[in-house]
């Protein structure tokens, strides 16, 4: 695929690939949190990706889209100068706590200081019933994000000191929009030049993956998607739906598990959980087949430098080279970003 965009890569170490001339529009992708799963390691934030689009003069921040809100999302946004009141919309790949628990904090802060609005669009899959009989509900999650503070009395106290705040708490600031299951990309949100499409993908009931298209480029947020087959035998661990969504995308952001965590290793990591993730090697293959230019690994299992993934010990801590090597083994020759918190890519329209 011929290069259409100039890429700036930055990480917490402020690594760069050069400078570019000012362009009319730009798209920026920032990994707000890269912790894989519920464990914590060295202060990494929970899973989340900020996608912003706009003019270079406005730092690509005319539209700000947050995909998943793991723990610490609000603090991470503050580090890059994004106030809670500036987020345009929030999208959930699925309602697991490591991807969603930061919404209450984000919206409580917004309720304190921006209770007059505007409301925040929350976009997610409609209620989905699992094979085990339980229902995953983004709508109920959003409706009840302030319940603990309501029942503790804090909401009443805050309203007494400022009756202009919305009486229902932070949930009153949410405009929830859901979509149904789809095996083909379907538009779920639009604003100006920005279009967001979604497709159903396998992980837990109601899991979805997203694609953002703008004049400055495109990015796919795979979430925790894995293959429709729950375990081998299968050709790959990756999602055919994500591969369809990622065709010719400029950037693919995807959660990743390293093969060292597999059942042939010594970590003792549960095979059913391993098999529902996409491996670093297979994601490299998917990115190559789809014609993706940039592959951003996030939600790393295990984290870089970690001696263990939760209670599961590793034979040795992994480095970025271990993840990049797996992508190359899968046949991907493009740019690989092994996610650290606040790593970013910027696309600028030529």
Question: Where do the model's predicted regions map?
Answer:
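Bacterial N-terminal signal peptides
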Residues: 6-17
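Positively charged n-region of N-terminal signal peptides that target proteins for export
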Residues: 1-5
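Conserved CoA-thioester-binding segment of acyl-CoA-metabolizing enzymes
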Residues: 222
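Cap/insert and terminal regions of metallo-dependent hydrolase folds
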Residues: 205, 216-218, 226-340
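Binuclear metal-dependent hydrolase catalytic cores
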Residues: 23-219, 231, 310, 319-320, ...
